[in-house]
């Protein structure tokens, strides 16, 4: 199961890296390195968080199935609740990494745009 999660994440990263080559950033030339750093953080740190949470989620599902097979079904509701809780945690972690990186890119773009406008005023 862990190998399957690794393959899915690697396929996702490869597709994302290919699509990132086609994206052009609009704005001052100074923004490009910072935007690349923010994208790097989103891709690798966000995917690492998603991987860790995904592996924990799959491990919990496997543990729950083992417990259900070995024990009676009376604690099935508790196990089901744990599965949904960890699934929600995985979704929240992925969404949080996505939002933080894109908010950082927007803020960096705006800061450098304002700085360029300020420099333009100084020259005039």
From Swiss-Prot:
Chief localisation class: membrane
Any single GO CC term annotated in Swiss-Prot or TrEMBL for this entry: membrane
Transmembrane segments: 37-57, 86-108
Cellular compartment(s): Membrane
Signal peptide positions on this chain: 1-19
Record keywords, A-Z: Membrane, Signal, Transmembrane, Transmembrane helix
Membrane topology: Multi-pass membrane protein
General remark: Partially overlaps ASI1.
The protein, known as: Putative uncharacterized membrane protein YMR119W-A
Organism of derivation: Saccharomyces cerevisiae (strain ATCC 204508 / S288c)
């Amino acid at each position: 199961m862990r190998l399957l999660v690794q393959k899915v994440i690697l396929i996702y990263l490869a597709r994302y890296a290919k699509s990132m080559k086609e994206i052009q950033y609009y704005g001052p030339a100074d923004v490009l390195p910072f935007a690349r750093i923010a994208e790097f953080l989103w891709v690798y740190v966000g995917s690492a968080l998603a991987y860790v949470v995904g592996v924990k989620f799959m491990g919990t599902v496997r543990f729950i199935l083992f417990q259900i097979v070995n024990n009676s079904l009376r604690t099935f509701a508790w196990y089901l609740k744990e599965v949904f809780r960890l699934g929600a945690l995985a979704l929240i972690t992925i969404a949080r990494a996505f939002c933080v990186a894109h908010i950082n890119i927007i803020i960096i773009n705006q800061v450098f745009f304002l700085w360029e406008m300020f420099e333009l005023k100084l020259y005039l």
